[in-house]
Amino acid sequence: MKFYLVGGAVRDMLLGITPKDKDWVVVGATEDEMLANGFIKIAANFPVFIHPQTKQEYALARSEKKTASGYHGFEVNFSKYITLEDDLKRRDLTINSIAIDQNNKVIDPFNGQADLQNRILRHTSIAFIEDPLRVVRLARFKAQLSNFNFSIAQEMLALIKELVKTGELNHLTRERLHIEFVKALNNPKIFFTTLKELEALKIIFPNISCFLPLIPNKSFFENPIYKGSNINEKITLCLLKIPQQQLDDIRKEFLLTNKHYKLLKASIAISKILEDRSITAEEIFQLIKNANIIRDKNLFAESLNLYKKYLKICDTITPHRNYQLLQTTINTIKNASIDSLTIKTIPKDKLRNTLKQLKL
């Protein structure tokens, strides 16, 4: 059996990036032989193994044949007679179809190194269009590698636009799209605009297609403050200007977790309260209550700090109200034990006056 380093790790190394993970392909081996050599199988129906010492992933070389719609519709062959080139040929892009053998020799049957040097994203074979997920992965790679300014090969653009017309993208699951979105958080604006260029955005993320101008520009995501944020924060910073009434649709579209949703909802409420000149005292009260930032002090602190972070990155927005007064207002509402009542039923006491001050 022979072992080859493959895929993203090789691509990143050739670009001068330290790879986060290393994946290996094994040629000339069977599942039983892998187990006999101490490898640990990690998938019941798929011959992928963990190395007993390095804990890195090793997969048997395979070929694929399209048999049905969607990205699950493939017949996979793991025969020990599958060659390295067979395995590399099934991969999506030439830059991901490069291998390094145990003697550190680069094996590049599809000229991926030339495409790396020329910053071109190109399909390895016509089989690219057999898997609709690869359209989303292409946009994600463009976002992930945004520092290198890759462009998409013209012949590939034409190929993808034909694929979009077939309806294959409708078979993608929200779970898989969520994973790709999170991986694209390096620069989601590039991710979305690339999908739009591929005529796929309206199909995959129809709500974002309507609100694409509200996603910050590319330079926003290149800011060190954004880059140093965690995933929850990046999702909120990306979607902060989406209208409050669209949040439930956005939540379904991206399959956001409860934590993502609560932080996003609270941050959008704070943004609207502090920036909107025309908002009424009643609307302020409802936003504060509905965002659950009265009861949850940690949520309020986290979302307010995140909004401040957004302002630092933008460096062009000046809130019309101050943070301290917002905190005072929330404390006043909490102490008044208001729940189902609206502000219109509240006498002109400290609560109403504080809300009116905040409105001003």
UniProtKB/Swiss-Prot annotation:
CTP binds at G8, R11, R91, R137, R140. Mg(2+) binds at D21, D23. Keywords: ATP-binding, Magnesium, Metal-binding, Nucleotide-binding, Nucleotidyltransferase, RNA repair, RNA-binding, Transferase, tRNA processing. GO terms for molecular function: ATP binding; CCA tRNA nucleotidyltransferase activity; magnesium ion binding; tRNA binding. Its cofactor is Mg(2+). Coiled coil: none annotated. ATP binds at G8, R11, R91, R137, R140. It is an enzyme of class 2 (transferase). It catalyses: a tRNA precursor + 2 CTP + ATP = a tRNA with a 3' CCA end + 3 diphosphate; a tRNA with a 3' CCA end + 2 CTP + ATP = a tRNA with a 3' CCACCA end + 3 diphosphate. Pfam families: PolyA_pol (PF01743), PolyA_pol_RNAbd (PF12627). Gene3D superfamilies: Beta Polymerase, domain 2, cca-adding enzyme, domain 2. One of its GO terms (biological process) is tRNA 3'-terminal CCA addition. Catalyzes the addition and repair of the essential 3'-terminal CCA sequence in tRNAs without using a nucleic acid template. Adds these three nucleotides in the order of C, C, and A to the tRNA nucleotide-73, using CTP and ATP as substrates and producing inorganic pyrophosphate. tRNA 3'-terminal CCA addition is required both for tRNA processing and repair. Also involved in tRNA surveillance by mediating tandem CCA addition to generate a CCACCA at the 3' terminus of unstable tRNAs. While stable tRNAs receive only 3'-terminal CCA, unstable tRNAs are marked with CCACCA and rapidly degraded. Belongs to the tRNA nucleotidyltransferase/poly(A) polymerase family. Bacterial CCA-adding enzyme type 2 subfamily. HAMAP family: CCA_bact_type2 (MF_01262). A single active site specifically recognizes both ATP and CTP and is responsible for their addition. This is CCA-adding enzyme. It comes from Francisella tularensis subsp. tularensis (strain SCHU S4 / Schu 4). The gene is cca.
